Amino acid sequence: MEDLHKVLKKEKYRKVKFKITKTQHLLIKAKINGVSGNFILDTGASNTCIGFESIGYFELSAKKSKTKASGAGATGMETQISSHNHLQLGSWKNTDFNLVIFDLSHVNEALKSYKAKAVHGIIGADVLLEGKAIIDYYNHYVYLQ
């Protein structure tokens, strides 16, 4: 697998470490507006999301949205949107990033029931697609270009 790293480095990919939790989720650190948080890396989530309780923590400016969110066993959830944020995973950056904000309490309650760490949000397919992501499950790295 070291060859994979060398090939991707030549293609200007950035390597970001993740951990596998007790619940088999991929846990990754990210910074939003310079503030570090814990996130689930979720290929099945269409958008990167933050919980309502983290609006102040990440210094987000939130606006109401007509879009309803669904996922992880919940549907029809109210959402807000936060535009023009700075997102960083390892050394990969996006300086004009939009986030969906919604109630993540059902996610964190499920994690707590397994004695797993609560998360601030979910890194979704929007980031993975933009970064042309390659996930190395064996070595626990996501590569972003």
Model regions: which residues?
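Pepsin/retropepsin-fold aspartyl endopeptidases
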Residues: 1-145
